Regions:
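Glycine-rich phosphate/pyrophosphate-binding loop and the adjoining helix
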Residues: 138-180, 184, 190-192, 210, ...
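N-terminal beta-loop-helix "entrance" segment that forms/cooperates
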Residues: 33-57, 225-227
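Glycine-rich phosphate/nucleotide-binding loop
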Residues: 45-48, 228-326
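N-terminal glycine-rich phosphate/adenylate-binding segment common to multiple enzyme folds
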Residues: 49-156, 242-244
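Buried hydrophobic packing segments
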Residues: 21, 25, 203, 294-302, ...
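Glycine-rich phosphate/diphosphate-binding loop of Rossmann-like nucleotide-binding domains
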Residues: 6-23, 28-29, 151-221, 233
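Extreme N-terminal starter segment of soluble prokaryotic enzymes
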Residues: 1-5
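Buried hydrophobic positions in well-ordered alpha/beta secondary-structure cores of metabolic enzymes
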Residues: 11-14, 67, 134, 173, ...
Length: 351
């Protein structure tokens, strides 16, 4: 198979972890006789510094004409510490999602046998956890009207959803549940929010189309609690943008390290794959960042091209590196810590 992949390294540790994912992907392509052409493009703070736009038109054109996008990280503290900044790196990610039609974020949460004791939660609570979040990405409060009134002393952010937006996200959720454990949980706050009531009634109306799927409805605060108490009780979770943003980060600690969790953002056309961790600017250029989440994001990419054996090869070599302790300092726990580039080389060599 020939694949054209847009490569958006982004900011902070993004370039370093992306480099390792490329190494591993190229090793997979060589082993399984595929051809990958990589097409680098700027985004985030790097793009602001270069052209003044966190998601330039040139970057969009490269992404839109590619089979998939592999993305590193976005963000820089100089923007975080400047509330007056009109242009911010994160605006590039929001713009990219909107313009590429990436309306659903797929965020798996699972455990690694060799790292189960690194989780802050008890082994018996989390062992065997295998759930996936489907978070709506292009609607809700992040994209609603916002502003200030009363000389800046009053602020507002509007949350708006259409039935069509909920339906397309829920459809993917039901389809995913059908291919997994046939359980779907819709997370909302329907006791107080009108948008949540729209979510609930829309999903309820779709239930009859998927009679094999067991559907439940839970308030977001209850789910935040149950994710800590018994995450194994969930299979597929669908939710709106803000709730999903918070819950997926909460769930990321189940595995023991945010540096291990991959994700995908999907729509009707191109798909984007990225680690869930941030840009970690204090580690940038030090060759110490954990690349495994980015490598596993590449595995998700292969899987979505129906290259399941290739995806499994990546997951197997990642599990092997964890079991044998060939890891970066965040996972070393007093043992030998390897550099980001060394981990990437080892993974590629052992594919």
């Amino acid at each position: 198979m020939k694949l054209k992949i847009a490569l958006l390294a982004g900011d902070g540790i993004g370039p370093e972890v992306i480099e390792q994912a490329v190494k591993v992907s190229d090793a997979v392509a060589k082993k399984f006789n595929h051809e990958i052409s990589w097409h680098p493009a700027l985004t985030g703070a790097a793009a602001i510094d270069a052209v003044g736009d966190p998601y330039p038109q040139e970057t969009h054109d490269i992404c839109a004409s590619s089979d998939a996008v592999l993305f590193g990280a976005i963000g820089h503290p100089r923007f975080d510490n400047d509330p007056s900044a009109k242009v911010r790196p994160e605006q590039g990610l929001l713009k990219m999602r909107k313009e590429l039609g990436l309306f659903a974020n797929v965020r798996p949460t699972f455990t690694f046998p060799s790292l189960i004791d690194k989780s802050p939660l008890k082994k018996e609570r989390i062992e065997g956890t295998d759930l996936v979040f489907l978070r709506e990405l292009t609607g809700g409060i992040y994209f609603g009207k916002k502003g200030r009134e009363d000389d800046g002393n009053t602020a507002f952010d509007h949350c708006v959803y259409s039935r069509a937006e909920v339906q397309r996200l829920a459809k993917k959720g039901f389809e995913m549940a059908m291919s997994r454990g046939k359980k779907l949980c819709c997370v909302d706050k329907a006791n107080v929010l009108e948008t949540s009531r729209l979510w609930r009634e829309t999903v309820q109306a779709m239930e009859k189309e998927y009679p094999e799927v067991e559907v439940s409805y839970e308030f977001v605060d209850a789910v935040a609690m149950r994710l800590v108490q018994w995450p194994k009780g969930y299979d597929v979770i669908i939710t709106e943008n803000l709730f999903g943003d918070i819950l997926t980060d909460e769930a990321s600690v189940i595995s023991g390290s945010m540096g291990l969790m991959p994700s995908a953002s999907v729509g009707s056309k191109v798909r984007l794959y990225e680690p869930i961790h941030g840009s970690y600017p204090q580690a940038a250029g030090k060759d110490i960042a954990n690349p495994l989440a980015t490598v596993l994001s590449a595995a998700m990419m292969f899987e979505d091209f129906d290259l399941n054996e290739e995806a499994l090869a990546i997951r197997d070599v990642v599990n092997k590196s964890l079991a044998e302790g060939f890891v970066t300092e965040d996972l070393a726990e007093g043992g030998k810590a390897y550099k980001t580039s060394e981990v990437g080389d080892w993974l590629a060599k052992n594919i």
